Amino acid sequence: MAKQTFEMTFEGRPLVVEVGQVAKQANGAVVVRYGDTTVLSVAVMSKKMATANFFPLQVNYEEKMYAAGKFPGGFSKREGRPSTDATLTARLIDRPIRPMFAEGFRNEVQVINTVLSYDENASAPMAAMFGSSLALSISDIPFNGPIAGVQVAYAAEDFIINPSASDKEVSHLDLIVAGTKEAINMVEAGAQELSEDIMLQALLKGHEAIQELVDFQNYIVAAVGKEKAEVELFQVDADLKAEIEAVYYDQLAKAVQVEEKLAREAATKAVKEEVLASYQERFAEDEDKETILRDVVEILEQMEHAEVRRLITEDKIRPDGRRVDEIRPLDAEIDFLPNVHGSGLFTRGQTQALSVLTLAPMSDTQLVDGLDPEYKKRFLHHYNFPQYSVGETGRYGAPGRREIGHGALGERALAQVLPSVEEFPYAIRLVAEVLESNGSSSQASICAGTLALMAGGVPIKAPVAGIAMGLISDGTNYTVLTDIQGLEDHFGDMDFKVAGTRLGITALQMDIKISGITPAILEEALAQAKVARFEILDVIESAIAEPRSELAPTAPKIDSIQIPVDKIKVVIGKGGETIDKIIAETGVTIDIDEEGLVQIFSSDQDAIDRAKTIISDLVREAKVGEVYTVPVVRIEKFGAFVHLFNKTDALVHISELAWKHTEHVEDVVKVGDMVTVKIIKIDEKGRVDASIKTLLPKPEKNEDGENGEEHRHCCCSHHKPDHHNESVEAPKKSDESETKE
């Protein structure tokens, strides 16, 4: 195929698609140019059905550092494992694409997106989502798209589609919505406590833009699309299914209605094992034994799926006996752990999450280096899902895509209520440990995170709670479920997570298994979630009504001091020598920003005070008129040097020692004497003159109107020589040995 180019203008930027020039051996490939962002999207499919009992779809999103004119970090100086942002973007693309393949499709499919050129004002993730859908749509892969996605911002009471970098800075909303021309099928959002009405408007506004992008894709597919390949779909033997249903359906249906999770799992497992054992014995010598047994396992899964959905839609009975809008039993507890900076334990039915708070100096913020300009990330929310939480053994290691995604959702939900750096100058890390799970563990981690933040004394604006909504739909009728458990998530059509405060929504995430949902379903789910959210907030606030006024004793305390910018180098010292010495002596952590704000962290207040005094002395400057009680550190013929602070000394000229004539400096002061002096002069070089006599009573004048002694031996200050320049004179800044005397 020769290169073909298609172009439209979308939201004020050119959107150009090139087909037929690159990656021609793949099933489908497109180059998408949006503004100055360029993404190559490629789709490939295996020739045969995979043996897995699921659809093996893999979506990758690769950020090449050259796309932004940047050099990769690290020793190898090349791209390594995907960044967290790249992993989250891959999930964003996967989620709206996955429902668009036929039931029973088991061929392996890979969709690879490579960012080749990056423009921060033209969304690369949205270009990649568009390119992924289009690469699948023009290929011979049987994909029931196209889909598209857009980013929506909200500022000045207006919605902005695919906002620029400057638009994002002032936006109260960061929403990504994807779908087909007919309906929405994926949502991901962070919001600053926006109402359900505004969120719904944003979703509908985004869907309008999606329709325009889908039309453009359909136009391209009509021009260059390949005929779809004939692939084998996984199907069970119809006669075998009818036979098993006739004998075992009622038995399995009864097991499904056992309310407690572990007991229900044991009951359904017993039925399935009985059926499987029967057919293993029956077909022990059959050459198609493996295929038959595989079908038996799939049929039993389909039977359980059908009965759970029938109970909810027809009988309005949920597996655990709840009403469709009923939340499982709730419990909230703080201070579960000693010696940490804050902890919260949240339990909802058989789902339980422990959240642990750690506070640290701002120097511990995470440095994020991707295609965007490098920045520091202050708040981290990490989510861990060990296999024991569901009573199973399994792999332990680095977090997978699911854990990264759930952690990011909690981070978005809670970030909206955190105090500013000016109000609370700490780096903040929350770790959610899922201890038990029967669905909605990500939302439990948000609730536990709220408890940990408030218990740890972080002055959040308001508590945040999260709830997961579900959907069972037969295409005509539907039922929206509040607080879905694992079985309802597994066999249901939607997982719609809503987090927020009493004022509004802070995060949304929606995944579905059908092609899309209507605005009416969205509206009902949001309204039902609001009621549930308030009920959960009541329980959270019964455990702790507001953030504690003080940090935990183990948490680092903080004090700050503002220093002149030109004094930063004084505090740091050559090669960091001075600041390292302060840290070693006091045990504190010190952060200094480019504007001279010095922040001192330690769990020991005395250590903070010592460090603050040292720094204050380092940058302190004497002022005319100030009075000090200080030691004499040096004697010269022309006067005495006194140590004011740090490395700053002052000269008390011999004429400023006393009102009467002084023949020898030692007649008045000696090294080591503590004297009270007043600063009388600071010259243009910063040299300091002080006086003792100005603080003493002045002698009465004689009959001639003069002070007798002073008149006979006049040594007036305005005529006295500049002894600061004499070779025997110690400099204004004494060495450290003198300072310590």
Curated annotation (Swiss-Prot):
Residues that, per the record, bind Mg(2+): 489, 495
Keywords: Cytoplasm, Magnesium, Metal-binding, Nucleotidyltransferase, RNA-binding, Transferase
CDD domains per the UniProt record, alphabetical: KH-I_PNPase, RNase_PH_PNPase_1, RNase_PH_PNPase_2
GO function terms (MF aspect): 3'-5'-RNA exonuclease activity; magnesium ion binding; polyribonucleotide nucleotidyltransferase activity; RNA binding
UniProt-listed InterPro entries: ExoRNase_PH_dom1, ExoRNase_PH_dom2, ExoRNase_PH_dom2_sf, KH_dom, KH_dom_type_1, KH_dom_type_1_sf, NA-bd_OB-fold, PNPase
PROSITE patterns (UniProt xref): KH_TYPE_1, S1
Gene Ontology CC annotations of this record: cytosol
Residues in S1 motif domain copies: 625-693
Composition bias type Basic and acidic residues, residue spans: 698-713, 723-741
Pfam family, one: PNPase
Catalytic activity: RNA(n+1) + phosphate = RNA(n) + a ribonucleoside 5'-diphosphate
Entry annotated with the keyword Magnesium: yes
Any one GO BP annotation for this protein: mRNA catabolic process
Residues of the signal peptide: none
Domain KH: 556-615
SMART domains, per database record: KH (SM00322), S1 (SM00316)
EC number: 2.7.7.8
Keyword presence, DNA-binding: no
Compartmental location: Cytoplasm
Cofactor(s) essential for the protein: Mg(2+)
Its biological purpose: Involved in mRNA degradation. Catalyzes the phosphorolysis of single-stranded polyribonucleotides processively in the 3'- to 5'-direction.
Family membership noted in the UniProt record: Belongs to the polyribonucleotide nucleotidyltransferase family.
PANTHER family from the UniProt entry: POLYRIBONUCLEOTIDE NUCLEOTIDYLTRANSFERASE, POLYRIBONUCLEOTIDE NUCLEOTIDYLTRANSFERASE 1, MITOCHONDRIAL
Protein name as it appears in the record: Polyribonucleotide nucleotidyltransferase
Organism: Streptococcus thermophilus (strain ATCC BAA-250 / LMG 18311)
